[in-house]
Amino acid sequence: MAERQRQRPEPTAPAIVWEPEVQRAMRDFSVREAHQSLNGLFKPRLAVYWADFLCSYVVAVASFWAVGPLGGLTAGGAAAFVVSVLAVFRCFAFIHEIAHFRAKRSFNRFRNGWNIIFGIPMLVPVFMYDCHGEHHNRRFYGTGEDAEYLPLARMSLWSSVQLLVLPLMLPLFGPYRFGVVTPVSWFVPRVRTYLYRNLSSLKIDLEYEGRLPKPEEKLNWRLQEAACLLWMGAVAALVATGTVSLGRVWQWCALFAAVAVLNSARLLAAHRYVGNEEEMSVVEQMMDTVNHPRNRPLAELWAPVGLRLHALHHLMPGLPYHNYQLAHDRLVSALPPDSAYRLTESPGLCASLGRLVRESRAHQKAGTLLPARAAKPARAVPSDERAVR
C-alpha cells in the first residue's frame, strides 16, 4: 500500500529547549551500546503472557461478580470494585504488547485469544490499537500523525484536565461505535470512511484521523465489528429476559469509566510532553518519556505490564514486558550516573503530574503556550484506501 501522504504544517512553536545537563547527556548517549547491553532479552515468552493475562482475567471476573452479593455501597463491595478495576486495567494493558508483536506469527494465538476473551467483550477489539506504531515512528512521534501525543506541557492546563474528565464518557463510545455507526457503515460508504477515520483508534488527540483498513484487513476488521455487535445484542437479550440485571450494566459502565480515567492519569505521567509537533530523534523521544522505577508494587497497579518503565520502552520498543526490570537493571549498572537514561526517572505518579502542571503554568506565564491548531489540510488518500467497500 502506498504510504499515506502527509502535509506537514509550518512550525508553530520554538524548538525544544532542553536543560544543559540533559543536552550534554543526550550527546554522549549511544543507543547502539544500550542495545548491545540487552542482548538476549528481546524474545517474548508466551507462557508468561498467557499466565499473567489469564490470572488477571480470573481476578477481574471474580471481583466484578463479587460486587453483587457484597453490595456495591458496602466496604466489601467497594473493595471488590477497586480490585476489578485494577485487574481489568491490567488485562487491557496487554493490547500494548499485542500492538508491538503483531508481526510475530508466534504471537497470533495470544492476540486472537486476548481479543475473544477480553477485547471484544470490552468493545475494544485489537484493530483499534493498530495506530500505536505511529507513536514509535521517528517521523510521527509527537506530531499531528501521532494519535497518542499532545504537546501538553506547552498547552493550557485545561487540556490536561480534559484528558481526565472526558474518559468518564467512554462507556457510551463502544455502544455508539459498534451498535449504531457500525451497522449503518455496512450500507453507507461515506459513513464507513468516517467510522475508520474518526472512531477506530485509541487516541488522546481528538483531531487525529486514522487510516482505512488495507484490502487484506477489511474482512478481519468487519468480523471483529460484527462480533462486538453480536456481543452487545446478547447482553441486551440477557437484560431483557431478566437473566442479567440492569444494575450489572451500570456496574460495567462504572468499571469502564474508572479504568479509562486511571489510564488517562497514567498517560499524563508517561511523557513530559515538551514536543513542538516536530520530529524527534530516538534519544529525544526517550528524554520526553518517563521511567517510574520506584515503589514497584504500587507502580504496577497504575502502570501495569511494563508501562511504568516507559522511557525504557521508547528506547527499546522491541523488548517484551517481562524483561523490562532486568533490562532496566542492566542499563543502570552499565551506564554512568549522569547518563541520559538515568535522567528519565521520576519518583512517582504525583511527581510526574506535578511537573506537567508546573511546565504548563510556566509556558502560560511566559506567554509561550502553543496556539490552537488550525484546521488540518485535507490529506491525499491513496487509491487503495479509497476503495473501502
Regions found by a protein language model. Give the residues of each.
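Non-catalytic, topology-defining segments of multipass membrane proteins
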Residues: M1-V83, F118-V249, H322-R389
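Residue-level signature of the transmembrane alpha-helical core
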Residues: F53, F81-V82, G113, I117, ...
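Transmembrane alpha-helical segments that form the membrane-embedded catalytic/substrate-channel core
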Residues: V85-I95, V124-M128, W252-S281
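Long helical/loop segments within the catalytic core of UDP-sugar-dependent glycosyltransferases
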Residues: L86, V126, P297-L307
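Histidine-centered catalytic micro-motifs
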Residues: C91-H100, M128-F140, L267-G275, V305-L319
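Aspartate-rich (DDxxD/NDxxD/DxxxD) Mg2+/diphosphate-binding motifs
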Residues: A93-G113, R139-L152
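Flexible internal linker/loop segments at domain or repeat junctions
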Residues: A270-L298
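Extended hydrophobic-aromatic, low-complexity segments
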Residues: G275-E279, P320, A327
